[in-house]
Amino acid sequence: MKPTYCGYAAIIGRPNVGKSTLLNQLLGQKISITSRKPQTTRYQILGVKTFKDIQVIYVDTPGLHAGTERTINRYMNRTARGALRDVDAIVFVIEPHWESQDAWVLDNLKEIETPVFLVINKVDKIKNRAELLPLIEKVSSLYAFQKIIPLSAKTGDQVGTLEQAVHQLMPESPFYFPPEQVTDRSDQFMASEIIREKLMRLLGQEIPYSLAVTLIEFRKEEKIIRISAVIWVEKKSQKGIVIGKGGERLKRVGTNARLDMEKWFGKKVFLQLWVKVKSGWADNERLLRELGFEE
């Protein structure tokens, strides 16, 4: 019987470097929400890619970041660090410049023996690739990376190079997931994340970090899925901002989310949204656990 190869690859980096976009590109479909705002990803998400006799389970993590005053930030850092345990490869994503936050992430890797690929993302924004040479020289002196790969997660340029490099590190093993499965997350989780993505894309800089989404109904019928969700905010003033004048903003969120859900589930979706205030939820460990954050 022909052997199969299967293993885990963690995607890490500071917030907003394009980790989730890279995961979606690797999988050939969207399973991790994206926005231009940092810290869009809050939960660890597995993306499964099976190609012939190789299965790679990519682990998309929240962005590692210094400054952990809020309880929710400490939870996200623990989640990201926890993803580094027992993986077969690490994909460390940066932008085409080196920042102090990148150095802080690298410090978290220096005691880990797992091979690390350095991905320089967003190279589609650079006119001349020769501009990357000083950066490549600098990072090469900081750590013995398995390979340094400039790519564009947005366009897909050189993503195949990364994929082939990761394949070479996968150990011989039976597949952990059926070949057709693309994520470990439930339909309910995907629905709540789609709603949160639309909120983050429509709202200002601060409010998205005070938002959470929980489902109170998820019912599959023959021709339609009925979903009811609560959007939690921390302050009464934020509730008005989320709803918008005459309910216009909440209506846009609902429409955009419903259209994405219908693509994901392959059937019609009836979606209802409510906005409620839960003061201090992002600093309350009990409430964070209720919302799906893990120790």
Swiss-Prot record:
Sequence ranges assigned to domain Era-type G in this UniProt record: 5-172
Primary location class: cytoplasm
Keyword Nucleotide-binding in record: yes
UniProt membrane topology term: Peripheral membrane protein
Location of the region described as G5 in the Swiss-Prot/TrEMBL record: 151-153
One Pfam family per UniProt: MMR_HSR1
Annotated localization: Cytoplasm; Cell inner membrane
Domain of life of the source: Bacteria
Ranges in a coiled coil: none
Molecular-function GO terms, alphabetical: GTP binding; GTPase activity; ribosomal small subunit binding; small ribosomal subunit rRNA binding
Region: G3, residue numbers: 60-63
Domain KH type-2 stretches: 203-279
InterPro entries: G_ERA_dom, GTP-bd, GTPase_Era-like, KH_dom-like_a/b, KH_dom_type_2, KH_sf_prok-type, P-loop_NTPase, Small_GTP-bd
Region span, G1: 13-20
Residues noted as binding GTP in the record, renumbered to the chain: 13-20, 60-64, 121-124
G2 as annotated region, ranges: 39-43
UniProt GO cellular component terms: cytosol; plasma membrane
Region annotation (G4) ranges: 121-124
Keyword Nuclease annotated: no
PANTHER family: GTPASE ERA, GTPASE ERA, MITOCHONDRIAL
Family: Belongs to the TRAFAC class TrmE-Era-EngA-EngB-Septin-like GTPase superfamily. Era GTPase family.
NCBIfam families on file: era (TIGR00436), PRK00089.1 (NF000908), small_GTP (TIGR00231)
Function: An essential GTPase that binds both GDP and GTP, with rapid nucleotide exchange. Plays a role in 16S rRNA processing and 30S ribosomal subunit biogenesis and possibly also in cell cycle regulation and energy metabolism.
Self-association and partners: Monomer.
Listed name of the protein: GTPase Era
Gene coding for it: era
